[in-house]
Every structure is written in structure tokens, then in C-alpha cells.
């Protein structure tokens, strides 16, 4: 059913969902020590500064913290993010669009399903599933080529 839902519908569906089928909350995830040399990160930082990078990392963390490989992007998620960082909804929305522009989140899946995901997020999700000896459950529609 989730393959036909857009992000806002997933927000509603997942707000009362238990962790059944998810890989549970991961206490940590990998961040490359060369991340600040990554052109995507550098372009994001150049345009939005440390605040943009912080919000990007927060959104990645939220997806993985929930034991998932994507974060549904809807008004509720945007408002929670803005509230957490004590910034405006407009700033958060602009930064998310910037993350998509530089390729930190997959633009096609964002436009089609209103979700934030990337190969890195999905790779971390797969590692979590392996670590917990659980089968990963990435829907075909949202799966990115993860090596």
C-alpha cells in the first residue's frame, strides 16, 4: 500500500504505526570522515551555511532513528523540524529544496512520493537490518541503486 501513498499520506499512516516491519531505532549511523570534501555537502554549506547542514543531518537522523530508509515529507514533518531548530517553515522548506538540488536527497522520489531518501540513507538502513539480523524491506518504487 505504501507504494501508492505520497509523503503526507505516509505521515498520517506512520504516525500511529509501530516498528513492525522496520529495523527498529538505530543508536548510531555512519558519517564519512570525508563528508566535508563531498561537493554536495560543500554546495549546501556554501548556500545555507551551518544551519543548512544541521537541518540536513537532522532529517537523515530522523529517518534512520525511526528505523526506516526514508522520511515522509509533509507539513507536519516540516513544522516539527522548524520547531526543533527554532527557525521558520520557509527556511526549512528552502533548505530541503536545496538538499534536493545538490543531490543529497533524491529529487525524483521527492517529487513523486514526497519522501526524503538517498543512497546513503538506504545503505545505512541495510546495514542496520544486517546488524539486527532482520530482512530489509525497501519497496521497489523507493529503492535506489545501493552498492
Model-assigned labels for residue ranges:
Residues 31, 71, 116:
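Short clusters of hydrophobic/aromatic residues that line enzyme substrate/ligand-binding pockets
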Residues 1-14:
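Single conserved hydrophobic/aromatic residue that forms the stacking wall/gate
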Residues 38, 53-57:
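Short amphipathic alpha-helical segments
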Residues 43-50, 58, 63-111:
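Winged helix-turn-helix DNA-binding recognition segment
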Residues 13, 17-39:
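Long, low-complexity, charged/polar intrinsically disordered regions in eukaryotic proteins
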Residues 112-119:
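Minor-groove-contacting beta-hairpin "wing" of winged helix-turn-helix DNA-binding domains
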Residues 33, 44-48, 117:
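Generic alpha-helical structural element
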Residues 119-147:
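Short, amphipathic alpha-helical interaction segments positioned at domain boundaries
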Amino acid at each position: 500500500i505504501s507504494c501508492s501513498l505520497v509523503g503526507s499520506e505516509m505521515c498520517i499512516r506512520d504516525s500511529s504505526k509501530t516498528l513492525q516491519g522496520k529495523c527498529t531505532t538505530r543508536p548510531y549511523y555512519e558519517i564519512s570522515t570525508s563528508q566535508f570534501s563531498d561537493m554536495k555537502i560543500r554546495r549546501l554549506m556554501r548556500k545555507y551555511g551551518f544551519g543548512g547542514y544541521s537541518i540536513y543531518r537532522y532529517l537523515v537522523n530522523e529517518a534512520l532513528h525511526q528505523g526506516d530508509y526514508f522520511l515522509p515529507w509533509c507539513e507536519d514533518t516540516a513544522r516539527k523540524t522548524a520547531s526543533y531548530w527554532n527557525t521558520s517553515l520557509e527556511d526549512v522548506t528552502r533548505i530541503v529544496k536545496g538538499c534536493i538540488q545538490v543531490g543529497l536527497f533524491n529529487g525524483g522520489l521527492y517529487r513523486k512520493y514526497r519522501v526524503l531518501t538517498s543512497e546513503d540513507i538506504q545503505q545505512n538502513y541495510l546495514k542496520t537490518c544486517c546488524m539486527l539480523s532482520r530482512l530489509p524491506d525497501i519497496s521497489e518504487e523507493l529503492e535506489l541503486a545501493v552498492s
